[in-house]
Amino acid sequence: MTRRRSRPSGGAGRRERARATGPQKPQAPEPPPPPSLEAGAGAGPPEAPAEPYRDDPREEDEPKLAPGPQVPPTTSQSVQTCCLLCHRERKGWEEGPSQNGLVLQGEKLPPDFMPKLVKNLLGEMPLWVCQSCRKSMEEDERQTGREHAVAISLSHTSCKSQSCGGDSHSSSSSSSSSSSSSSSCHGNSGDWDPSSFLSAHKLSGLWNSPHSSGAMPGGSLGSPPTIPGEVFPISEHHRHSDLTAPPNSPTGHHPQPAPLIPSHPGSFGSPPHPHLLPTTPAVHFPAQVSECPVAVAAAPHTPGPCQSPHLPSTSMPLLKMPPPFSGCSHPCSGHCSGHCSGPLLPPPSSQQLPSTHSRDPGCKGHKFTHSGLTCQLPQPCEADEGLGEEEDSSSERSSCTSSSTHQRDGKFCDCCYCEFFGHNAEKEKAQLAAEALKQANRSVSGSRELRPARESLLGWPDRELDRVNSFLNSRLQEIKNTVKDSICASFSMCELSVDSNGFSKEGATEPKPQSLAPSNPSGSSEQRPDINLDLSPLTLGSPQNHMLQAPGEPAPPWAEMRSPHPPWTEVKGPPPGIIPENGLVRRLNTVPNLSRMIWVKTPKPGNPSSEEPSIKGAPGCKQELPEPVASGGKPRKGKRQGNQAKKSEVSPASQSPACLETPSAKGQTPSPKQPSKAPEPPRVDSCAEAGEGSQGTRPGPGWADSPKADKEKGNSWRNWPGEAKARPLEQESVQPPGPARPQSFQQGKGRSRRSRNKQEKSASSLDDVFLPKDMDGVEMDETDREVEYFKRFCLDSAKQTRQKVAVNWTNFSLKKTTPSTAQ
């Protein structure tokens, strides 16, 4: 029958054969326990009901048995007290099982030893199935191999819900009961779904697999069919010689599961189990039950109720060891392969539990609770087990329980084995594979998605670089413009006169337009171009070069400037040009690049007046005008005039180039200068007067000075139109007229300025104009602040070139300026 059944049921048949081979052996030794078990559990009647339940209403059977007998027995007994399937009390069983299971099977080993071995090796105590349940399972399996799987699922569910869920689970101490109970427990929990259980065939396979797994193949026994046959032989053999087989703790343990297996397989793989049941099942089952009860009592189901004593000692080891033995966690073992002996027990419930167990916290807990029986332990059992097993089992079970909880949620226990082979391995595997594929796809797609972004990021730097370059270029242009403006401003008299001489920018500005209009409208326009050209002069050469370059240096504005410059250079000779230009030249020389610019600028406004040596008033006015022009034309540059004034400071350094220029200028200058001096003194005076009138008193005093002073005045004139401010400062600092004067800013210029500005505001104005003010903690206009920064810059720059400052500005001919102005 068994084989026939097993053939139809496939894995079940093999299992049965295996059981027949292996289990029958144990049946001989174990037969007594089954009767005792049956007697205890209501061997006759309970079995009958169990069988019916097994056959069709196993669910009902289990529930019926579970509610009444199983619950109390479970609670009362430390071992599985109820049949896994029918949940009948295992009182009789226990007596037999404890003695038979432990003694018969464990005769070789101490009763405790077997449970420990089982616990450690099998990792789960065997679940007990009453003979009635076994028979019913056999019948069920025979009648409905698949149906029984469902029935088992249901019966387990019912068991779980009925007895296992209640006391049965608590009483799941009895291995069978526990197995059933865990199943039913889960059912009771409502976590266990008949659907969640593997088909009877599959379950029996799993059960067998757990049995064989009990032999340790269970862990890896992925195929229930192979394992079942193997398991039963091993399992049953171990069952009847379970304690003898404890070495094969899985086997020894399996014997306990074997009963469970038979019961569940009876349910699932009725053929194998029935086969075992008739021959070995009854004996095996009882024997195992007896043996298992001890083991179970020790480790599995009493965890909460009866087994609390056993469980703590045995159950703990079982649970703890079993999980490892199972391969991972007890739940895993039970569920995973049912492979572990522990799993065998759970497999019936576990295989129903496979998913349930893995999903059902109860199942996990049960597994842990009774190791092998853990699955059978219902969640209640879990709780009980937690109590019975306490720290050991509970801790393990807690992990298992958490796993079980996850299992309930459709997740499976975390054990390695369960992950791959455990509860509903195929489904799980498929799910896991699908998830893995999804994740892989996500990662791949994510990486693909990220790649464009990364590429875009890579591309971004180019755009950013362009942006940065454009920004820097614009900033550079701004800086250039700023420098130009600063230079122009430095030379524009407006701010210089206002800052250094105290002249109102307006006054200076007014003269500037006036002089520009009268003397050189083009000059004023040139002045602005000069400002624009500031960079060009800066980039050009030294003032000398500037002089030479003036004609040769072509720059949009510089071309104009240079055209003026050549005239300017030519005009150097003219005294008027010399005087204003000397100042310009000095300053320009002081700051070679700046001086070029300044030359152009100042000459533009001032040169016209300089160009007219005969016209003193005109030069004066023009001189005045230059500063107004610069200031009016470039008030902001006026700010920078202070900066330029600084540059004037810097200009001393340039002055050496200026000196070079100066010599040539000097060559021209002496005669022109003197001639200009002759006219210039008056002119300077007049200019000074005019300048004073328009710009302030500053020009007057200085301008009234000697011809040299006039020359310097001319220079200063340039300065006071171009650097009114700087000039006074220089004058103050460098009152003694001398290009070598310490203030390299405008030593040459400084002389004339000193004379004039000294009288006016020389000391204070010069310092104010050329020396950067302390800007820390001082509130000042942004423009002023820029001017101060520029002054500081010029001062620092001037230091570098001061050595060049030794220029005889007196010899410098301002005619250059005049031509520039004429320009």
Swiss-Prot record:
Keywords: Coiled coil, Cytoplasm, Nucleus, Phosphoprotein. InterPro entries: FAM193, FAM193_C. Residues 52-64 have a biased composition (Basic and acidic residues). Residues 382-393 have a biased composition (Acidic residues). Pfam families: FAM193_C. Residues 168-184, 263-281 have a biased composition (Low complexity). GO terms for cellular component: cytoplasm; nucleus. Residues 1-78, 158-191, 209-281, 381-409, 503-583, 599-775 are annotated as: Disordered. The keyword Isomerase does not apply. It comes from the Eukaryota. Signal peptide: none annotated. It is found in: Cytoplasm; Nucleus. Residues 422-484 form a coiled coil. Residues 516-526, 641-657 have a biased composition (Polar residues). Residues 26-36 have a biased composition (Pro residues). The modification Phosphoserine is found at S694, S706, S813. Belongs to the FAM193 family. PANTHER family: AGAP004327-PA, PROTEIN FAM193B. This is Protein FAM193B. The gene is FAM193B.
